[in-house]
């Protein structure tokens, strides 16, 4: 199965418009979809998005999902593990690549942050389960 995304050449992004709170996220965290579509019910597709945390925004629980995730922190601070367990604080130019099934988070940001994320189901494996 091929990865399907619209062909987009360089174009300006309007960072003031087109943001929405993703399902299951608290207010203060918003996404802007740049390309693709991820269908979590059919376990197909991919998406590229920006995710931003306002200053003080936080999630309350760890995340786990059945698709690959790549995350690059463009600006600001991101604190991982804000659940009474060990925490790590990351700044710009940090990157994570997570296979399906990896627990991560919860997250918070003291000053706010902007993340570039790519999510995708592995088109080469049945059910997209990671076999690593």
Predicted features and spans:
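Active-site pocket scaffolds in enzymes
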Residues: 82
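Structured binding elements
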Residues: 71
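Ligand-binding loop in jelly-roll beta-barrel domains
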Residues: 100-125
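Glycine-centered positions in the ABC transporter ATPase nucleotide-binding domain
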Residues: 75-76
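Conserved short histidine dyad/triad with adjacent acidic residue
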Residues: 31-65, 79, 87, 99-103
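A short, N-terminal "cap"/entry segment at the start of jelly-roll beta-barrel domains
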Residues: 1-45, 130-132
């Amino acid at each position: 199965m091929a990865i399907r995304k619209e062909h987009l050449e360089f174009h300006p992004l309007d960072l003031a418009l087109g943001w929405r709170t993703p399902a299951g996220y608290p207010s203060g965290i918003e996404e802007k979809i740049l390309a693709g579509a991820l269908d979590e019910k059919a376990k197909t597709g991919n998406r590229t998005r920006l995710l931003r945390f306002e200053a003080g925004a936080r999630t309350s629980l760890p995340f786990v999902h059945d698709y690959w995730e790549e995350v690059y922190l463009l600006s600001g601070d991101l604190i991982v593990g804000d659940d009474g367990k060990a925490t790590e604080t990351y700044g710009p130019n940090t990157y994570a690549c997570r296979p399906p099934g990896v627990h991560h988070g919860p997250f918070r940001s003291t000053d706010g942050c902007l993340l570039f994320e790519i999510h995708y189901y592995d088109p080469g494996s049945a059910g997209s389960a990671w076999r690593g």
